[in-house]
Regions:
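Surface-exposed loop/turn segments connecting beta-strands in extracellular beta-rich domains
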Residues: 1-6, 31-34, 56-58, 62, ...
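Surface-exposed loop/turn motifs in large extracellular/passenger domains
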Residues: 1-3, 10-26, 33, 41-51, ...
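Structural detector of coil-to-beta-strand junctions
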Residues: 8-10, 37-39, 63-67, 92-94, ...
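Intrinsically disordered, low-complexity repeat/linker tracts enriched for polar/charged residues
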Residues: 35, 90, 99, 114-117, ...
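Arginine-selective low-complexity/disordered segments
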Residues: 43, 187, 261, 300, ...
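N-terminal capping/linker segments that flank leucine-rich repeat
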Residues: 127-144, 486-507
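N-terminal extracellular ligand-recognition/capping segment immediately after the signal peptide
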Residues: 145-170, 178-180, 184, 505-530, ...
Length: 866
């Protein structure tokens, strides 16, 4: 016989399959020894041991005194009024139980390594009814402690269990469906550091403590099929406070509470679970309902689950939980030192009808996070009590400002019927956040961002949204004031993105119109909303298939840091604007219109800053009755145009003097242009700028103001730099160099006037000022620099050097058949200008000259007709 099978040195009740009974009474078992069960080994039958003593029995492996064990049968043993002293074994110093054991009114002293080892599948009834009984039983049992009745804390023992039953050993407690009730007298369990505890199939109620109303865990705790309800903590962890490792599975947390509602400096919470700094939390298949009682928005509380340590939550259900920062879950990595962050992972879970001011579903404050395959439905963030409604954000998820460098992913999730002031479903203030494969439907915000609101006064969140669907969110799907990426590659993508987003739309790739979508975008992407589009340096190409943008009346649009190319339309090849449009750091090149506005046609308000217009064109070259043009910009009758710091180059391609075209910028409405650069633009009436107040009714005129700008090497028959036709104008601090008005093609050279500026006949009563400007090396037939045919024109503090005219007025020609110009010149210089007549000036009308210097003009300075 091998020693491994040596059992029961005193008594063995072996396996036979018979239904037997046995009684051991008034007996003493001392100094017995075996490999298994030092004194008694019971493998079958209903056996009663009563009024017996077991002293100094031992087993090498298990059951120093008694083993209740069988590989075949299911023995049931009851031990009554017996004593176990100084028995020993590796497992179960006194008793090892594998099946059914009841112990009544018995005492255990000095047994080792433990008193009772109860196997996981076994049932052990120790008659536990009070917290004292429970504490004693935990002291006795190793393995699994089973409960066979409900347990309640009594008033008499409350003082001893303020911190709960202490568990400082590895143990599994099987509640067998019973309830442990602390009666609001104290905590239920405190689990020590370094110990592994499992609690299963039990209900814990009415626990109350400063932290962790039901459980305070410093060890490694697993809760399986446990219900925790109506527990409360003064500050943190209404049901559970975790400072160790906590695993929760298939459990319920209901109506747990936080007593103190916080202050300006302290935020309490975690009514279900508070996972502390070093805590690690895992939750699966569990329900969290109605946690935080009687919440008011003035209460400074965080979510049903609050976590500073790492947390993983899966396949769980959160309903009707409340808190100021996170009704269901709050994660607070911002409390960690330096750049450290914690991680929250949530998957396969449902958040429904939770409430809170910020993130009624999930509140993220300085944490990396992943939310996948979740449902957020009917969560709400609304102000009441002493909280104004203006601050209620993100009914489903809030990612708030903390200054931490965090990342977040939201994927495969549904957001429906959520409601807040800002960000009906999601509000994002920081981090690099990716949202993909998700549905946003019927979410609403009272102010902005029906589905998503992206904004911060402190940080610069970057948000990417891909492969997601937005349906019936109000007032719009997305409001963005920071950086948003939507994976836009086609015009259809761009139109959809604009329809989704309010605030700022960010482009993260080049965009091109495809042949398949061209028929739908002949007039371009329609913008009928206020929006900012940040191109991030990317290019939008219409591929000569249609216009790029059409902007509706009454809407304010900003386009920045983008390139628009190959747009084509009847008017406004790249942009047709009826609204209020700002172009900043935008390049428009190789766009074309059939008639007006090769790049932009403006019928609203247009502001252009630090932008480039290059090689834009007009396809039709006009007729005797129609003058087309504005290859860069055509500013229509009611248009208001402001341009600053921008370059206009090479607009109008392959110009011929027979082409009836007006300048790169053509304006009928008012226009202000400053600090800009015009080079190598061409047109018949105004190569660079044409202003046409003559087209306005009656005596009305428009106004052109040009300052601090350079006009170089522009070409045209009349006013290669600026052509003025019935407009008030001011030109100040500008440079006009090497502009030419010369005839070619079928145009005779006799009519080529004013290479820099032409003020032509219209019979309008106009006024013009030219001041502080330089005119050098300009050349024309008449008026090498300026030709003036009408208006009250004042020229002051300007220089005219090396300008020339083939016929007359090397610098200025004042001459007309129909008009009556009145010109005054003061404080100016005319040097080295030349013409056949009037090397500097020819005057046929009314000229006044004061304090002006003439040097080396040929053949003379002024030729004045009588």
């Amino acid at each position: 016989m091998t020693p491994n099978n040596n059992n029961g040195a005193a008594i063995v009740v072996t396996d036979t399959g018979k239904d037997i009974t046995g009684a051991i009474t008034d007996s003493n078992f001392t100094n017995n020894k075996a490999h298994f069960s030092g004194a008694v080994d019971i493998c079958e039958g209903k056996i009663t041991i009563k009024n017996s003593i077991f002293v100094n029995n031992s087993a090498e492996y298990c059951a120093g005194a008694i083993a209740v064990d069988s590989q075949i049968n299911k023995p049931a043993v009851e031990i009554i009024n017996s004593k176990f002293d100084s028995n020993s074994a590796e497992y179960g110093g006194a008793i090892y139980n594998y099946y059914n054991l009841t112990v009544v009114d018995s005492t255990f002293t000095n047994n080792s390594k433990d008193t009772i080892y109860n196997f996981r599948v076994a049932n052990l009834d120790l008659g536990i009814k009070t917290f004292t009984d429970l504490q004693n039983a935990i002291g006795l049992v190793r393995g699994t402690l089973t409960l066979d009745s409900d347990i309640a804390m009594t008033d008499d023992e409350a003082a001893n269990f303020k911190d709960g039953v202490a568990i400082n050993k590895n143990i599994r407690i099987d509640g067998k469906g019973h309830t442990i009730d602390a009666m609001d007298l104290g905590r239920i369990f405190s689990i020590g550091e370094g110990f592994t505890v499992t609690l299963t199939n039990a209900t814990l109620i009415n626990g109350k403590a400063v932290e962790g109303g039901a459980i305070y865990n410093d060890g490694s705790l697993t809760l399986s099929d446990v219900k925790l309800s109506d527990n409360a903590a003064d500050s943190y962890g209404g049901a559970v406070f975790n400072n160790g490792h906590l695993v929760v599975g298939n459990s319920v947390f209901e109506s747990n509470d936080i007593v103190n509602r916080g202050s300006a400096s302290v935020d309490y919470g975690g009514a279900a679970i508070y996972n502390w700094y070093d805590g690690v939390l895992t939750v699966s298949g569990s329900n969290f309902t109605n946690n935080i009682k009687n919440y008011k928005n003035g209460d400074r509380l965080v979510g049903a689950i609050a976590t500073i340590g790492d947390a993983t939550i899966s396949d769980s259900y959160f309903v009707n939980n409340t808190g100021r920062w996170g009704g269901a879950i709050s994660t607070a990595g911002y409390l960690l030192a330096g750049d450290d962050v914690n991680t929250l992972t949530v998957s396969g879970s449902t958040f429904k009808e939770n409430g809170g001011l910020y993130g009624a579903g999930i509140f993220v404050a300085g944490s990396d996070f992943t939310v996948s395959d979740c449902v957020f439905d009917k969560n709400s963030a609304f102000g009441k009590g002493d909280m104004t409604p203006n601050n209620n954000n993100g009914a489903a998820i809030v990612v708030t400002d903390t200054g931490k460098d965090i990342t977040g992913a939201i994927t495969g999730s549904n957001f429906t019927n959520n409601k807040a002031q800002y960000g009906g479903a999601i509000y994002i203030c920081e981090g690099n956040i990716a949202i993909s494969d998700s549905l946003f439907e019927n979410n609403s915000a009272d102010v902005e961002g029906g589905a998503i609101d992206i904004g911060s006064a402190i940080n610069n969140p970057v948000v990417t949204v891909e492969n997601s669907k937005f349906v019936n969110n109000t007032p719009q799907a997305i409001h963005n004031s920071k950086e948003l990426h939507l994976g836009i590659e086609t015009f259809t993508d761009l139109q959809n993105a604009i329809n989704l987003v309010d605030g700022i739309l960010t482009l993260d790739s080049d965009i091109a119109m495809t042949d398949d979508e061209a028929a739908g975008f002949v007039n371009g992407v329609i913008i009928n909303k206020d929006i900012v589009i940040d191109g991030k340096g990317h290019t939008i190409s219409a591929e000569d298939l249609g216009r790029i943008f059409s902007i509706g009346e009454g809407f304010t649009v900003t386009l920045t840091n983008a390139t628009l190319i190959n747009g084509k339309a009847d008017k406004g090849g790249a942009i047709y604007n009826d609204g209020s449009l700002t172009l900043s750091d935008v390049k428009l090149s190789d766009n074309a219109a059939d008639s007006y506005g090769g790049a932009v046609f403006n019928n609203g308000h247009l502001v252009v800053g630090n932008s480039v217009f290059d090689s834009n064109d007009i396809v039709n070259r006009g007729s005797a009755s129609v003058d087309y043009g504005g290859a860069a910009i055509y500013n229509w009758y009611d248009g208001v145009l402001t341009v600053s710091g921008s370059n206009f180059t090479n607009n109008i391609k392959n110009y011929k003097n027979g082409d009836r075209l007006v300048g790169a910028i053509a304006t009928i409405g008012d226009a202000t242009i400053s600090d800009s650069y015009f080079v190598n633009n061409a047109g018949r009436w105004g190569g660079a700028i044409t202003t046409s107040g003559a087209l306005l009714a009656g005596d009305d005129v428009n106004t052109l103001t040009v300052s601090g700008s350079t006009f170089k090497e522009n070409g045209g028959l009349y006013g290669a730099g600026i052509f003025v036709w019935g407009s008030d104008f001011t030109v100040s601090d500008c440079v006009f160099d090497k502009n030419t008005a010369s005839g070619k093609g079928n145009m005779t050279p006799n009519n080529n006037n004013g290479a820099a500026i032409e003020v032509t006949d219209t019979n309008k009563a106009i006024a013009g000022i030219i001041t502080g400007s330089k005119f050098t090396n300009n050349k024309a037939q008449y008026g090498g620099a300026i030709d003036i045919c009408e208006g009250n024109i004042k020229i002051t503090d300007s220089e005219f050097v090396n300008n020339s005219a083939d016929v007359e007025g090397g610098a200025i020609d004042i001459n007309t058949v129909n008009g009556n110009p009145e010109v005054s010149i003061s404080g100016s210089k005319f040097i080295n200008n030349s013409a056949s007549y009037g090397g500097a000036i020819v005057n046929v009308k009314d000229l006044t000259v004061r304090n002006t210097e003439f040097v080396n003009n040929t053949p003379d300075a002024i030729f004045n007709y009588v």
